[in-house]
Amino acid sequence: MAKIGLIDYGMGNIHSVTKALESLEEEIILIKNNHQIKDCKALILPGVGSFDPAINNLSKTELIIDIKNWIKSGKSFLGICLGLQLLFESSDEGTINGLGIVKGQIKKIPQLSDQRIPHVGWCELLPTRKNSLLKVDELNNWVYFVHSYHAVPSNNNLITANVSYGSEKLTAMIERDNLMACQFHPEKSGKTGEKLLRRWIKSIQ
């Protein structure tokens, strides 16, 4: 059993993520300052809400440098929903710079005549390449989304799965070495979400 640090900065779906991980019999530490990180084997950055308030709240915890150093050192890290978006350089939603850990931008989901924004509901993951959480030919994995913005990484090779949005494809998951992140909510995605969390936990270094 690995100690998993769940970053608590006032913008997260803390309760539901904690409950999901505890159901997998994992030990969770709520991280509110950098002194609590040292005992963790992996970190999760969850998030629900808007980009600028999230960056401001994260800044108040004084954890930003620690998060960057954590990822740079090769330790396991998972971003969830807004937690994925904060990893990027900027967002159409706000004016404050993101963490810049992943090159690219967060863009407003395009308005399509046959689709609604926010993009809410169950959608099938479409794997794009080999990765730690999904096999390339693994289909019928439905997960739950709630978002109005989507990630556009500068390097498309970071994308490990997309989701269909009308005629468009939106980024659903990214992976780079020890860093993984998903736009959907695995903690609200039933058996598929549980499976993906188990695989992430198994990958913890």
UniProtKB/Swiss-Prot annotation:
Family matches, as InterPro entries: Class_I_gatase-like (IPR029062), GATASE (IPR017926), Imidazole-glycPsynth_HisH (IPR010139)
Entry keyword Hydrolase: yes
Q: How does it assemble?
A: Heterodimer of HisH and HisF.
Start and end residues of each Glutamine amidotransferase type-1 domain: 3-205
Pathway where this protein functions: Amino-acid biosynthesis; L-histidine biosynthesis; L-histidine from 5-phospho-alpha-D-ribose 1-diphosphate: step 5/9
Task: Spell out the PROSITE patterns in the cross-references.
Answer: GATASE_TYPE_1
User: What protein does this entry describe?
Assistant: Imidazole glycerol phosphate synthase subunit HisH
Where in the cell does this protein reside? Cytoplasm
Known catalytic reactions: 5-[(5-phospho-1-deoxy-D-ribulos-1-ylimino)methylamino]-1-(5-phospho-beta-D-ribosyl)imidazole-4-carboxamide + L-glutamine = D-erythro-1-(imidazol-4-yl)glycerol 3-phosphate + 5-amino-1-(5-phospho-beta-D-ribosyl)imidazole-4-carboxamide + L-glutamate + H(+); L-glutamine + H2O = L-glutamate + NH4(+)
Domain of life of the organism encoding this protein: Bacteria
Q: Name any one Pfam family assigned in the record.
A: GATase
